Amino acid sequence: IDIAPRELPVHIAGSFFAQTADTIQDRLHARCLVLDDEVTRVAILTVDTCVATQDLLDEAKLLAHQATGIPVDRMLMSATHTHAAPTLTSLLGSGENPGYRRWLPAQIAQAVTEATANLAPARIGWTVVRAPEHTHCRRWIRRPDRIDTDPFGRLSVRAMMHPGYQNPDYLGPAGPVDPDLSIVSVQSPEGRPIGLLANYSMHYVGAPPVSADYFGSFADQLTTLVNVQNAEPPFVALMSNGTSGDLHWMDYGEAKPAQPQSHIAYAEVIARKVFQACKDIAYHNWVPLAMRETTLPLRVRPICADDLTNARELTATFADRLPRTLPELYAREQIQLSQVPPEREVPLQALRIGELGIAAVSCEVFGLTGLQIKALSPLAPTFTIELANGYHGYIPPPAQHALGGYTTWRARSACLEVEAAPKVVEAVIHLLETVSGQPRRTLTGDDYPLGDYPRAVLASKPAAYWRFNEFEGPRATDESGNRHDGVFNPGIAFYLEGPSARGNANVHRINRAPHFAGGSVNAHITGLNDTYSVEMWFKDYLPADARPVTGYLFSRGPAGVQGAPGDHLGIGGTATGQGRLLFYNGDALKMTLVGDTEIPAKAWHHVAMVRAGRQVTVYLNGSMLAEIEGQAEASYPPATEQVFIGGRNDGFANFEGRIDEVAIYDRPLSADEITKHHAAAGAVEP
């Protein structure tokens, strides 16, 4: 159903500040697919809009129910998230279109009505293909010496969306990418295409308004590819938005493209991928359908009294106009949020189509959360449709709140509690368990056998072994069996790609690693004396000329003690050993041992440190020859249990980059063991 506005100009959604459009570049649509297994009938619908509020979609569902009989809790309606469509609600600095808002629910309902009228015998199938080259993390971590100021005047921005291409102020992505392009295809029993639902985690491309962006162009181009342009009833293609809260098409680690990205060209590439993938789909004449929904109560983050006072003072200076700056904009948001209830009911859904699972969340969801839902779901494959059945703003994973940025700034578009994302995951997984009748996956045991590297480490019987595959903190799980779990401290981004060699992972999953952005991991290891070893993989992101010490990888010593008594392994900076490994035993003894090899940044390296009494030896990248070798007294108190990963025991010069596969031994590893461990990983890509 065509839902392009009938009257122009209109206010356009998706920007911090107000913008309008008086031209329609391409048509907007509400597209619907209705499925029926003779027991359950469900409607899946996408709307070419940025966000659609729950009251609007509830109104559309009621109208559709009255026309079709489909229960309102068997309808999944989502916004595509084009940033070139009319606003349906006032967010940030955007204006409103009350006439368009009143007109739209009936048009959405009409899409459900027409799809229901076109029900016919069909077969269904699904598949998933990977498209990692077309979506990337758009939220990047800033250098520790270049932290930015938020609209409230606080120096808090360690991560931000859209850093710009190869911006030297930024280090690397703050989150993982979900590269899956999921496809559900419906055909007649004879093989004529009827409809297709795709799902991809990519925010939008960008198009001049009014436009459906690539979501609409994808539907048009796929219709042409399957050669059913004039079919009756017409073929309907839907592109739903996955968990793209922090994902976009730009790869900010590369040079800026010579030509701007066209939403039409982008849609063509994705449509061709889908078209090719459909050739290998196995179809089923019947599959069971099941759908459940719930509402999850989530708190609105409270405003502090000082911020509210400051907001009132600032908004008084522009009472007769719209905000023009970010401080003005967010001041107005604080006033508006101070007047809303302290809790929201967030709608969630789960849909089963045979062995396929679909989750629906009414928020802007980060890629990590989508990957977590996929990993835990009892149904395989599973994908998530965001901005479904309402709009409740960004829900960053909890660790991202410590890094700041506009997806964490308190506004109507980002106001839910810090723990919202894991609570959503838990509720959605419970719904998927209900519709499937199966328990969630645990990500351990025989379903996920270990690769050669972790097997080699475990065979050497470490006192502690942290693989750092966690989706979230605060617990860093010790996989040695010795119960030396660690604690992730704030300033860490989770679940990015770790050392990529197959030996480091298991046969089913990418090896994962956290990015340390000012945070560290601390743990207590019982039974350590002055003879012990530590090994790990690391990938430094901070330039070696940024500060006196580039960053500490490992530290053993009492926490927070002045002078940092202990063993400290790191990468030198401008003070000494620039870009090379160094060992330091604290300010009292001041023994510094420095390696010879310059450590290339943004590449994975393996390091092992062995203390045997006064002798300290460090090995790099599996070499039998020591990188560092010398005598250094232990300055930590006897039998010190405290160890730190990614930082020093006094918090000085914490590491900036990724660390993975950390093992500590209560004995000296031999050079031969270290070399064999490194070899077990295989060839590691940068």
Task: Pin down the residues of each PLM region.
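Conserved beta-alpha junction segments in alpha/beta enzyme cores
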Residues: 1-78, 82-236, 242-253, 257-268, ...
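Extracellular/periplasmic catalytic domains that process cell-envelope and extracellular macromolecules
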Residues: 36-38, 69, 175-178, 187-191, ...
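Short, solvent-exposed loop/turn and secondary-structure capping segments
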Residues: 87-90, 136-137, 249-252, 397, ...
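Extracellular structured ligand-interaction cores
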Residues: 121, 179-181, 195, 234, ...
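Extracytoplasmic low-complexity segments
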Residues: 445-519, 543-551, 557-565, 633-634, ...
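Extracellular, beta-strand-rich glycan-interacting domains
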Residues: 463-472, 532-542, 606, 652-681
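Extracellular glycan-interaction surfaces
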Residues: 487-518, 535-544, 568-634, 649
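Flexible glycan-contacting loops in extracellular carbohydrate-active proteins
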Residues: 628-658
